Amino acid sequence: MAVPKMVFSDVESFLDSHPELFEDYLNRKGSSSMVEKWLKNHQAGKSEAEPKEEKSSVCKDSWASKCDGLQRRASQKELRKTFARSKAINVNRTYDEHVNSRAQEPLTSMRRRALLRKASSLPPTTAHILSALLESRVNIPQYPSTAVDFKYYLKEHNEREFFLELVKDISNDLDLTSLSYKILVFVCIMVDADRCSLFLVEGTGNKKTLVSKFFDVHAGTTVLPSMNSGEVQVPWGKGIIGYVAEHGETVNIPDAYQDRRFSDEIDKLTGYKTKSLLCMPIQNSDGEIIGVAQAINKSSSGELFTEDDEKVLQMYLPFCGIAISNAQLFAASRKEYDRSRALLEVVNDLFEEQTDLEKIVRKIMHRAQTLLKCERCSVQLLEDIESPVVKFTKSFELLSPKCSADAESSFKDSMEKSSYSDWLINNSIAELVASTGLPVNISDAYQDPRFDAEADQFSDFHIRSVLCVPIWNSNHQIIGVAQVLNRLDGKPFDDADQRLFEAFVIFCGLGINNTIMYDQVKKSWAKQSVALDVLSYHATCSKTEVDKFKAANIPLVCELGIDKLSFDDFSLDVDAMITAALRMFIELGMVQKFKIDYETLCRWLLTVRKNYRMVLYHNWRHAFNVCQCMFAMLTTAGFQETLTDVEILALIVGCVCHDLDHRGTNNAFQAKTGSALSLLYGTSATLEHHHFNHAVMILQSEGHNIFCNLSSTEYSDLMQLLKQSILATDLTLYFENRNSFFELVSIGEYNWNVKTHRDMCRSMMMTACDLGAVTKPWDISRKVAELVTSEFFEQGDRERSELKLTPSAIFDRNRKDELPGLQLEWIDGICAPLYETLVKLNPKLQPMVDMINANRVKWEELDKKRQHDHGASVPASPCSAAEGSETGGVPCCSNNTPPTHVS
């Protein structure tokens, strides 16, 4: 029976009239490839609404009408499949043609609330914020390709338009994967080949290979093959493909099996029979071969590839070379961007975690696996970085999730084994890197003599490639090694991997070193805490002593004589000074007004006494004498009536504590020797800051806080005043403030109601009490001067022996006969102006000035006798008193002769 001749338009018209027949046929005969082809053509048809050329308008209209018809008949299931497919495709796309249109759509109130809930449900971490900031803002446009059938139509009706269409399709694609696929399909169409393959050159120098991610692609294929199907690799120079790549020649073979260069390995691998073959190199703009295009078997049975086919490919492949080069450049730049971003994220990880070694190593290994895409990562830390013997004390290991069902447990298991020195596979290479400091990159482990193949054979994990680099600290010392094993793609680690890993490990070394240092600091802090606890126990008084003074009868002020400005500094023994100090607190009403527990006061005074060192002058007796002088000024001179109770308490406590833990040397000596105190407090008022902090430490000790019953405001004010009082004993501050104070008093503008005036007055009172020995009767004043000089001589001896310096006159034991002259300078330059000004403010202090003048006469007589005995005047050493002061840098006096004495 003769079949009537039909044309496509008749069939299409019939199907339009009977859609149920078309659906029935599609359900019975349709395949998944047909559906995928329809989806792709449907998307392409939507983007081609208007033709650019009159000549192709009829054909494009027919394809569009067909797609529209199919779209009208699409079921909800097909629409869901379309959405799912488009979503899968767009997951990793850098550009979405629908993004801008969606962004312009107004948000409904419901959607706005949903977005707000999503945004505010969890606070963003720094890692998420950094990731968002580093997200690439470069959008690469992607244009859909026209249908394959349409390209066949153009090939038959308009070769020029056909060629331009193929060039346009590849020129807009910067994704190397989709570009390679397009080139294969287009080559098949151009030369009418049954199969096509594209091999790209990878590697450099003598390590070049030809790799094909898409092999044996049909011209009618519309969906990209799976990336999991594996890739075909051809060695450089092997087979016809290798020959073409090596020599850059076109090969057109009518019968491949008759050519000795042909290798049938791929045919055996694919089960496909190669007959005719056309193979041509692809070059970049520099003429370098970057790939090989291969067309296999003409679609028309029995036909061979012609010279026209060669000419067509010779015209088209240069455009392919440009497109491939651009895609490779973009891929390389994208890879560098990803690596740079990963390194920044590593830095963020290291700054986020610097306290736990296990956590930071774990983050490092996760990042290393992400960066280098390896199966296994390990970090080993040296036991002693100074030792020439390599011994690892800690080893950490992490398996890739693709190699281990539970990466968490694999990490923990390796931690449990960290006490064993031989648990880590291939430990010999790690030891080699740790000893030499040079990285090791092994592409084939079993071919390298440094690799322990026997250990690998007994393991469940088999090593192919190894990259091991040293970990350095900030002092360029090796603290460990980092090692990655087996790239996931099966390739060896290349030079780019090694450079990246070395850069990565630099940051890791800093992070690990900081964590180790933190651990050391934490241990040191613990040791210090224990030491302070022990010292605190031995630095505090015993309960027996406290009970003794708590039960003792306290003599009256008149019995002790502590209210006199001429009090004998050596009249009381060490225990009597405690009872006298208790009497001062009681007499001033401090115990009652501030509700000071009497037992706590006894304990505090005894502990303060115990924390004064047994030096010649700056000891407990000096502290008590300064406190007694302040007590006399407050009571006898009447300053108690002018100052507040909090100010009085701060002054008394400040006097008792103003030289706590004095070492018998001044501030200048601390700076010269670079002592721990100068490093801790700096070179400005070094000892005074230490005295205050030591006082605070005692107050904070259990059972010693005599201020515990003060209100928070009173306590805060008192501590500020206490610090000010103790720091005021630094003569540098005295010289900074005295001119202003002297001028205010001299012109009668001093005002007790002005805070700055009161602050200056209290500071001057502290200095006056600290230097009070010069106002005592001659025998007492001279004895104190000799004690001070003896202490200075000991410092001078240390300067000469330890620092190899010649001490100034006041510290030089060989010049002790110059003491009278230095004392005259001390009185005239520092003491007399201070007390004379205080007398103008409070005339009741006149006895102190009178005694200074009397003592000056005595020193002047001794100085004249010294000059007479020597037969000439011997001037004092310049700036000797400046060094005698605890500041070591006080200004010289008005007569340009520096003062000499110090309290």
Curated annotation (Swiss-Prot):
GO terms for biological process: signal transduction. It is found in: Cytoplasm, Cytosol. This is Dual 3',5'-cyclic-AMP and -GMP phosphodiesterase 11A. It comes from Takifugu rubripes (Japanese pufferfish). It is an enzyme of class 3 (hydrolase). A divalent metal cation 1 binds at H622, H658, D659, D770. Residues 863-903 are annotated as: Disordered. The keyword Metal-binding applies. Residues 175-324, 356-512 form the GAF domain.
